[in-house]
Amino acid sequence: MRDVYILGVGTTTCGKFPDKPAHILGRKAAWDAIKDAGIHPRKIEIAFCGHVYQGMGVGQRTLKEIGLVGQPVVNVEGACGSGTLSFWEAWRSIAYGQYDIALALGVENLSRILSGGP
């Protein structure tokens, strides 16, 4: 098993964003992490995107916005632990030698979720 290092991080501010889709918020966080790492986006070999309520393909929509196309993007869902699960998957893929550079992100915008209750 190989050592794994975090090269960069990015986030959005916490708050209510009813007019911004989750993939737009995720794009900012992903781009900030890539800039913080000091790497070119095409160096990323695989990405894992954790989410719960954003529907199919949110990882692909998020990363297409910053030019990441052609690399595998795996959407993972684990309720409140979805972002952590995406990080674990990225760590595992590097630790076991499948990839050298992976991106892990969690994408959600609960301001846009309609209430399903009474």
Language model segments and positions:
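Conserved "HGTGT" condensation-loop signature of ketosynthase/thiolase-family condensing enzymes
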Residues: 1-73, 92-95, 107-118
